[in-house]
Amino acid sequence: MLLLKKQTEDISSVYEIREKLGSGAFSEVMLAQERGSAHLVALKCIPKKALRGKEALVENEIAVLRRISHPNIVALEDVHESPSHLYLAMELVTGGELFDRIMERGSYTEKDASHLVGQVLGAVSYLHSLGIVHRDLKPENLLYATPFEDSKIMVSDFGLSKIQAGNMLGTACGTPGYVAPELLEQKPYGKAVDVWALGVISYILLCGYPPFYDESDPELFSQILRASYEFDSPFWDDISESAKDFIRHLLERDPQKRFTCQQALQHLWISGDAALDRDILGSVSEQIQKNFARTHWKRAFNATSFLRHIRKLGQSPEGEEASRQGMTRHSHPGLGTSQSPKW
């Protein structure tokens, strides 16, 4: 699919702008109707003056989206350029964000979570087959296509995606609680970082709180570097061993031993009947409501901040001794009382 930038003096000659859908770091997304038809798009409007120094990021997003055609990935339909703006006409998805939809459900089971994760795995496996690493998978980037109950889930936001020309990538990026250990260590990394993020998302979908959490970034990073998480009681008491086994394979600290997307798709929790049909909506929705209003989980992240922290603390990147001696772990967001550190 080759999408050339179509030149226009005024985007209103191409689309009727209806309303604002949202905004990002340097763009706004508008609901727009194509002139001469009833076709609606999500129009990403990027001022060129905001692009100075960021041109490569946007060009990369366009390059990635041009290569993609998958039923569970939001499509780029057209690209327009005016003297002042760049416009990306994206497939319109109207079903809302993942967590919001879970909260609105009448019931929610492991089988529902398994079905969701399976769809995302299929989309990410497709990206990986093209040599594309998403690099910023998180619940906010998982949207429902329609408001209907049987709607499919869609992967969105390819601003940080990268086409993996060689074997590994080197630029650290992502969102704090979802980044893989090798990314924090600033080692070359690849597709396995997406699998790790899917492990974090799968964990949250089954209990409503994140596996790695602390108000202090250095301690959060230390937990991630050690892959230090637990299946806390009572939140995990009714979750199957198969689900826990699946998550362990995705949250494997060593990227060489971590499941690939294909291996994850073949796990019985995804491909078989291992996912339980017990309703877990009450517990999960309560924890989602409690934990994901936190702006902490929406901050942008660059791993250089982590390196500054550990240098000040005199730690190695593995973050062992200084964190044992100098930091106290805050209460886990899913738990009512402070826990002892998980050393």
Swiss-Prot record:
Q: Quickly give the catalysed reaction.
A: L-seryl-[protein] + ATP = O-phospho-L-seryl-[protein] + ADP + H(+); L-threonyl-[protein] + ATP = O-phospho-L-threonyl-[protein] + ADP + H(+)
Q: What class of enzyme is it?
A: transferase
Query: Looking at the keywords, is Cytoplasm present?
Result: yes
Q: What's noted about post-translational modification?
A: Isoform 1 and isoform 2 are phosphorylated by CAMKK1.
Q: Which PANTHER family match?
A: SERINE/THREONINE-PROTEIN KINASE
Task: Kindly provide the name given to this protein in its UniProt entry.
Answer: Calcium/calmodulin-dependent protein kinase type 1B
EC number per UniProt: 2.7.11.17
Keyword Ribosomal protein on this protein?
no
One GO cellular-component annotation of the UniProt record comes to:
nucleus
Question: Where is this protein primarily located?
Answer: cytoplasm
Organism of provenance: Rattus norvegicus (Rat)
- The primary gene name is Pnck
